[in-house]
From Swiss-Prot:
Protein source organism: Dictyostelium discoideum
Annotated GO biological process: ubiquinone biosynthetic process
GO cellular component, one term: respiratory chain complex I
InterPro entries on file: ComplexI_NDUFA9_subunit (IPR051207), NAD(P)-bd_dom_sf (IPR036291), RmlD-like-bd (IPR029903)
Record key words, sorted: Electron transport, FAD, Flavoprotein, Mitochondrion, Respiratory chain, Transit peptide, Transport
Function noted in UniProt: Accessory subunit of the mitochondrial membrane respiratory chain NADH dehydrogenase (Complex I), that is believed not to be involved in catalysis. Complex I functions in the transfer of electrons from NADH to the respiratory chain. The immediate electron acceptor for the enzyme is believed to be ubiquinone.
The protein's name: NADH dehydrogenase [ubiquinone] 1 alpha subcomplex subunit 9, mitochondrial
Cofactor note: Binds 1 FAD per subunit.
Amino acid sequence: MLKNLSKGFPSLINKRSFSTINENPLTRIHHGSRTQTTGLVATVFGATGFTGRYLVQLLARTGIQVVVPYRCEDEGFRDLKVLGELGQIIPVRFDIRDSESIERAISHSNIVINMAGRDYETRNFSLDDINVHAASRIADLSKNVEKYIHVSTLRASEDSPSHFSRSKAIGEKLTREIIPNCTVVRPSIIFGDEDKFINKWSKVSQNWPFIPRYNQQHKIQPLHCYDLASGILSILETPGTSGKVYEFAGDEVFTWDEFLDMIIDGTAQYSKLNIPVSNDFMKFISEHLLERFARNPNFIKDQIDYHNQDMTTTVGALTLKDLNVTTTPIQEKLIRLSRMYRPGKFFNAIANPQNK
């Protein structure tokens, strides 16, 4: 599709030849007009996902033409097309198992960003299919691009009991072997409007008869989805980022207990029981009940294994501060995201009893 478009409309894709973006920063060569471009083309795998759409928006604002590989129906990428000017966002149908379709999606690009990932298995794709085989396939076909960014996950380890963590670690390792000068991003737990973090725990506090508290003293460092996108854009704009590994996380560190207290305040579910439970109990419930009978289970055994550690940046790691990105405090977003899960009677309460 992309090749046909470029033949029929030579000006559709404007590739900047002989650019030096691999070592030098991405330069904004336009001066104010929205319709002017930098001459750069970026392919973003995972652009139709939760965090991908924010990155597409920022790249388009910068004047970069964005190729969006998709495998969904047209409705899945339609909202992305309005994030840029006419012809700036280019959807291309692809199959993650088909090398030819991947090559077609990156054939005109200076920049390739792999944000495609999966934290649960489906009937069509296993964790290894996406996080290992697809990651290495995309990297192998992108060896000649000028800038390659691979998005992994924080605390990924080949020795982890979590299949997700192991698959992410192996995918990252293979990518760095194929493209030694690629930039790796390891984001922490991500929150935002469509997340599976604040929304998930808010639903649990609303629908469950009790709130299970496990991993109570393990620490977390949540990251806002827009900060992840801003960090990736800053990597493109900052010199000397090639071949480096960045760990993206928020500035604030909480224990799971402190986070759940914030969820209870946000949802006003003060009457719910708070029951400390062991990891083994939660894994049993998840594996034998939720994953078997729930269509969209709130808890997955593998994710419980993955979160059974401190989800914080490691000492000495490069972070968003090194890219001059200011992070968003979770308190700024949590109330707005969780208030929809409050009980109806909460909105009938008298704000000031003296003025009945």
